[in-house]
Structure formats: structure tokens, C-alpha cells
């Protein structure tokens, strides 16, 4: 049976990638359908009840800058907020929030149900009908056909998912949910290159059985209280609660070692590779054998539950070993497990077979986003989902895709890393992955992306108005600081000397003073009882804080940022030089067989992408550039 209505875009999966994809497509005016096996689990935080962190928080800010839901939902559901790396430079400062699972799901579902142009349908998808090389829609488990111009697949860990607890295993997408076995088989029929990855989760603990009095309390930040969304306010936050810190010990490690003979990871039952930066406790004990202790964060799952998430002891050991290892930890001697930890193996598809739009090269109109592409983490999934939803929507309208650059966003870094390099293990974002991270900060994601989002139809009038007000205020205040001068003999000189802890030797603008070590924007405007304070930055105190932060960072780091902008411009030429899809690299004289094979395998779209493939040297790029100019006369056409 065929459904009575056709859609512009169908999104399969209601996790973090799927919800952002569906919302983005619908905001752009596309008639969008989100199909999920469980409407109750839309936006569920399947593992750690937190959003953000180093690199990840940057992605959330970028999603928010373009009108996405994750940051705003976190402001409504976050029960603890912290700024990580607050004492370090602005490039690596990152927001992290502990979330209430129930409140977060409710916030996401409310946005989905109230989004114009978006329909929801509960069903499992088993098939993707393809005509020629173009996807036509989806077919559900009960045989119902939904037709669409474009399809976004965000299947998470559900594709042929297998859950492991000790040597016992069973099919599942996550605890309590079925695996997508038929859909996985269908994708393999389409000859898409596939592999297996693994992730895991710790046992959940009844908080009433934990002795917090012997643990270290970890409160959130209070002055100021962070927010995630550029439109967020601390007043939106629910009740704030602490996390708690404990540690494993030698007894814990002995218990784990004693159970390794029944570990699916260490007996060869699990074949998939797990995330390097979120290892299981078994891996930690094995890889860091000399350490006698590992930190554990006891994180509350929400305000209406007693469950705690012991971050740091993800495990797939048998339940009896989990029970003993938990009870060996200080403060958890009487702890009761309410949900066992487990590992899950699942199919992923090589992201090198994707275009930068996240459309598959093999099947036109089919887009992949999230863990299906080999990533790990809610934030990485949400960023891909938004991008896939945007590009599916643009394609449905007959428009060119939006391809974010590495130099303009962490989303661009993420996608380029996946497509140029592929994955050998679950990929997670770090600030260290971005070569232009001083320009890609949390505080300026809106300055980088909101105008783009507006042009794409993603940003509503209210967000646009607030952004324009902020942008104008930052420009006005920066100019004011550049045009107020103070000399050694001026009335203000004593105040400046006191601030600098030395005499002012020459005339300086306030902007120049702000660039000095230890000088802040707040200290400048407080001089002489506020003689240089602006009349007002904005009536909205939250926006005023954003403005002052933006002014201080842009002024203080102006020289570094300008040098980075020059470097970006220099790289742009080769970065955007298009490579013909039909180019046979074995015909490029001078390239080694290895490089020829890698280029023919990956089929990079631009010279910049080619340069990020492992083993492709600058010398190889020079030979390729000569070939393009000499044999193809391609240089001019590449930029048209």
C-alpha cells in the first residue's frame, strides 16, 4: 500500500541526527516526514545524560546559530552547566551541561510536534526502493510505502545491532529497542561499503544506595550561570544539582581482570572497534595497567529519578562482575544496579563513499547522518543531521548544496575529516582537529553562521533580529574602544597606570590597552568610576554579556585572527579547485601506485580534499595540479 501523500524529504530515525535533519528541512519550507520506530523516544539520550564538552560544545553552538534545537532544548533540560577550560584561551573554552533525560526528550518532541511542514509517523523502515540510481522513498515493516524526492537515513546503532552482556548477546538497537536487521541487509544489497563498530554504556545505579558523603562534590558554575543557546537565559534552567566524583581502586581492577575470560571484547566475540576516547573500563585496565585508579563521575539522570550514570565504567562484563566491580568503589559499597551495562555492535557505512553534502555517491537522493557514518556522540550526530537535512531540502528544491568549509565551522571540519580520511574507529570531535580553531570559537558561531542560516531559510525573524542587534553593538563598541585615546599626561593616566601596574609611556587607545596581558574589558570600563563605560550594550543582560565577550576577544586577539584569515585566504584557491569525477588517477604521470590507488578509491571532489587523504603528499598534489593544467586545461573550468 502506498501512503496518500508524497513528501519532499523523508528522515528515517528520531535520534539527535534525525530530529535536527527533520527540523532543518521543515524550517526551509520542505514537506518533511520523520519516521521513527518509537515516537516516545524522539531525542532520547541513549547513553551519557550530557550535552557538550571540548569540541562538542562548539558543534552545539553552531547548530544553534543556524536555528537548530539541541542548545535550546538543553537550556530547558540542563540540571548542571559548566564552562570547561575556562582558564585557557577562548578557542578551547567549551560549554557542557548535564541533562535531565525526560525534560530533554520533552523539549525536542515539543519542537517537532509544533514545527510547520513536519509530520511524524511511527514505524520501522525495512526497505529503500531505488529506481535507476535514485532513491524513491521508504517501505515500512508493514509494507506501507512513503514516496519522497530525498531520503535522510539516521539509523544510529540500530543497523543489525547486537547487544552484549558477558558472553550473552541478542539483537537490539539499544536496551529495550529492536535492531534494524532488514534495513541493514537492504543497504548491503546496494553495494555500499560497510563495516562494524562498537560502543558501550555503564550500569545505572540507584542513587538511594550511594553514599555521597565520602565522594567529592562537583557543582556547576554559578557566576555567571552558563547557557547553551545564543537566545538562552539562566532562568530557563530547571533546578541545578551537583555531580559527584569517586575512583576505582586495585580491588576494582582485580575484579575486572578476573572477569576478562568472560568479556566479549577479550574473548573475540565482539569484532567491532570501540571509541578510543570513551573506552570501556576493561580497556582502561588493560591499556593503562600501571595506573592504580581511574576517576568516576556520578551523574544524575534527572530530577524525577534516583538513577545515576557512573561515567567512566562503561562495560560489557557479565552482570555478576559488574555488580562486584561497582560495589568495590568507595561510596558504592551497597550500591544497587538498576540497569546493567552493555556493549553494542552495529553496522556503519564508509563515509568516504559520501559527497560533502552527505549524499551517497552510489544512490542519488540518499543522505546519511550520524553514527551510520562512523561517528560517536550526540553532538556529532546532530551536526551531521542538520547538514543532511539542509542539503536534502536544497536538493528537493533543485538548488545547489551547502558545503561548509573547514575554515568556517566545526561542522565543516567534521564532514571533511569523515569524507577525506574515513574512520577506523568511532570519530569524535576535538578542538585539536581544527587548524583554524582561533577563528572557530564558541562565542562567535553566530557571527560565522547565522547569516548563512538566514539565507538558507533556517533562521526565523526573532533570532535574526537579536543577531543583528548584537552584531551592530559589537561593531559599535569595538569602534568606540579604538577611538578613545589616553596619553601619559591626561587626567585618566593615573587610573591606567594603576591598572597596568606601571606608568603609561605613550598615547594608547583603549583597544590597545585591552590587548595587554591581564587587562579585561570589564577592567577597562571600570576605570575612574566608569568614565569609559558605554551608555548601554543592550537592555538584555544576557545579550550584553555576549557582546562584551565578543568585543574583548575580537580586540585582544585581533592580530592573531587577522593572520589566520590571511592563511585561510591563501589556502582557499587549492581548497576549492574541483577535480573531475571521471579523472583516472592512474593516468597522472609521476604519481606513485599507492597514491593513484588511494585517489581512485576516494575520488576527492577538490584538490584540498585530495591533500587530506593519508599518503597524498604535497609533491603528489603538485603533479596533480600540473596534470590538470596541462592535459585537461581544467584550472579555469574548476572555478566556474
From Swiss-Prot:
Entry GO terms, CC: cytosol
Entry-linked SMART domains: GIDA_assoc_3
Keyword NAD: yes
Chain sites annotated for binding NAD(+): 274-288
GO MF: flavin adenine dinucleotide binding
Localization terms from the record: Cytoplasm
Main location: cytoplasm
Similarity comment text for this entry: Belongs to the MnmG family.
The name this protein goes by in its record: tRNA uridine 5-carboxymethylaminomethyl modification enzyme MnmG
Record gene name: mnmG
Amino acid at each position: 500500500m502506498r501512503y496518500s501523500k508524497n513528501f519532499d524529504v523523508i528522515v528515517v530515525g528520531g535520534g539527535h541526527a534525525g530530529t535536527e535533519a527533520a527540523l532543518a528541512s521543515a524550517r526551509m519550507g520542505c514537506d518533511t516526514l520523520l519516521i521513527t520506530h518509537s515516537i516516545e523516544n524522539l531525542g532520547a539520550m541513549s547513553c551519557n545524560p550530557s550535552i557538550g564538552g571540548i569540541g562538542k560544545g562548539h558543534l552545539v553552538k553552531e547548530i544553534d546559530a543556524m536555528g537548530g534545537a539541541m542548545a535550546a532544548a538543553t537550556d530547558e533540560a540542563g540540571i548542571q552547566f559548566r564552562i570547561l577550560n575556562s582558564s585557557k584561551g577562548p578557542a578551547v573554552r567549551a560549554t557542557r551541561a548535564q541533562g535531565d533525560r525526560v525534560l530533554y526528550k520533552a523539549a525536542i518532541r515539543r519542537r517537532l510536534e509544533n514545527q510547520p511542514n513536519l509530520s511524524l509517523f511511527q514505524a520501522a523502515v525495512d526497505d529503500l526502493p531505488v529506481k535507476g540510481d535514485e532513491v524513491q522513498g521508504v517501505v515500512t515493516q508493514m509494507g506501507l510505502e512513503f514516496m519522497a524526492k530525498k531520503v535522510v537515513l539516521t539509523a544510529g546503532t540500530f543497523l543489525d545491532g547486537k547487544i552484549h552482556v558477558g558472553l550473552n548477546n541478542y539483537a537490539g538497537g539499544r536496551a529495550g529497542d529492536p535492531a534494524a536487521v532488514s534495513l541493514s541487509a537492504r543497504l548491503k544489497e546496494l553495494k555500499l561499503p560497510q563495516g562494524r563498530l562498537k560502543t558501550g554504556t555503564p550500569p545505572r545505579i540507584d542513587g538511594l544506595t550511594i553514599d555521597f558523603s565520602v565522594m567529592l562534590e562537583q557543582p556547576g558554575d554559578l557566576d555567571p550561570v552558563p547557557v547553551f543557546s545564543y537566545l538562552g537565559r539562566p532562568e530557563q534552567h530547571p533546578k541545578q544539582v551537583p555531580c559527584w566524583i569517586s575512583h576505582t581502586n586495585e580491588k576494582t581492577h582485580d575484579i575486572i581482570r578476573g572477569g576478562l575470560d568472560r568479556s566479549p571484547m577479550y574473548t573475540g566475540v565482539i569484532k567491532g572497534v570501540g571509541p578510543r576516547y570513551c573506552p570501556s573500563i576493561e580497556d582502561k585496565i588493560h591499556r593503562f595497567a600501571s595506573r592504580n585508579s581511574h576517576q568516576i563521575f556520578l551523574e544524575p539522570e534527572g530530577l524525577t529519578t534516583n538513577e545515576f550514570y557512573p561515567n567512566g565504567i562503561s562495560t560489557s562484563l557479565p552482570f555478576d562482575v559488574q555488580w562486584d566491580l561497582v560495589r568495590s568503589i568507595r561510596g558504592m559499597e551497597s550500591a544497587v544496579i538498576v540497569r546493567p551495562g552493555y556493549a553494542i555492535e552495529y553496522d556503519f557505512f564508509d563515509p568516504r563513499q559520501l559527497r560533502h553534502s552527505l549524499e551517497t555517491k552510489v544512490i542519488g537522493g540518499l543522505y546519511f547522518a550520524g553514527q551510520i557514518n562512523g561517528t560517536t556522540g550526540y553532538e556529532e550526530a546532530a551536526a551531521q543531521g542538520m547538514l543532511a537535512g539542509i542539503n536534502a531540502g536544497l536538493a528537493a528544491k533543485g538548488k545547489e548544496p551547502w558545503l561548509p568549509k573547514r575554515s568556517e565551522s566545526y561542522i565543516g571540519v567534521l564532514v571533511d575529516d569523515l569524507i577525506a580520511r574515513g574512520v577506523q574507529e568511532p570519530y569524535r570531535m576535538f578542538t585539536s582537529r581544527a587548524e583554524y580553531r582561533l577563528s572557530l570559537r564558541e562565542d562567535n558561531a553566530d557571527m560565522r553562521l547565522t547569516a548563512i542560516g538566514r539565507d538558507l531559510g533556517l533562521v526565523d525573524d526573532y533570532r535574526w533580529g537579536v543577531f543583528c542587534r548584537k552584531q551592530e553593538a559589537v561593531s559599535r563598541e569595538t569602534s568606540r574602544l579604538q577611538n578613545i585615546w589616553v596619553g601619559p599626561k591626561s587626567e585618566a593616566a593615573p587610573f591606567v597606570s594603576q591598572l597596568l601596574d606601571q606608568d603609561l609611556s605613550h598615547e594608547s587607545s583603549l583597544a590597545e590597552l585591552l590587548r595587554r596581558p591581564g587587562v579585561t574589558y570589564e577592567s577597562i570600563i571600570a576605570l575612574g568610576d566608569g568614565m569609559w563605560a558605554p551608555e548601554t550594550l543592550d537592555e538584555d543582560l544576557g545579550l550584553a554579556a555576549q557582546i562584551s565577550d565578543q568585543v574583548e576577544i575580537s580586540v585582544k586577539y585581533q592580530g592573531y585572527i587577522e593572520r589566520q584569515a590571511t592563511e585561510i585566504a591563501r589556502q582557499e584557491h587549492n581548497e576549492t579547485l574541483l577535480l573531475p569525477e571521471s579523472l583516472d588517477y592512474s593516468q597522472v604521470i609521476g604519481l606513485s601506485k599507492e597514491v593513484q590507488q588511494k585517489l581512485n578509491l576516494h575520488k576527492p571532489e577538490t584538490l584540498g580534499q585530495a591533500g587530506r587523504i593519508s599518503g597524498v603528499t604535497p609533491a603528489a598534489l603538485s603533479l596533480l595540479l600540473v596534470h590538470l593544467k596541462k592535459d585537461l586545461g581544467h584550472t579555469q573550468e574548476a572555478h566556474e
